[in-house]
Structures are given as structure tokens and as C-alpha cells.
Amino acid sequence: YLPT
């Protein structure tokens, strides 16, 4: 996942 992409950290936001």
C-alpha cells in the first residue's frame, strides 16, 4: 500500500 502507499503511505499517506
From Swiss-Prot:
Tissue specificity field:
Expressed by the venom gland.
Q: Which UniProt keywords apply?
A: Protease inhibitor, Secreted
Q: Which GO terms describe its cellular component?
A: extracellular region
- Superkingdom: Eukaryota
A GO molecular-function annotation: peptidase inhibitor activity
Where is the protein found, in the record's own terms?
A: Secreted
Any other noteworthy remark? Answer: Is a stable peptide that is not originated from proctolin hydrolysis.
What is its biological role? Answer: Venom tetrapeptide that inhibits activities of the human peptidase neprilysin (NEP/MME) (Ki=0.94 uM), the two mammalian endopeptidases EP24.16 and EP24.15 (Ki=36 uM and 74 uM, respectively), and a probable cockroach neprilysin-like protein. It shows 3-fold better inhibitory activity than proctolin. It may play a role in human envenomation as well as in the paralysis and death of scorpion preys. It does not inhibit ACE activity.
The protein here is known as: [des-Arg1]-proctolin
Phylogenetic lineage: Eukaryota, Metazoa, Ecdysozoa, Arthropoda, Chelicerata
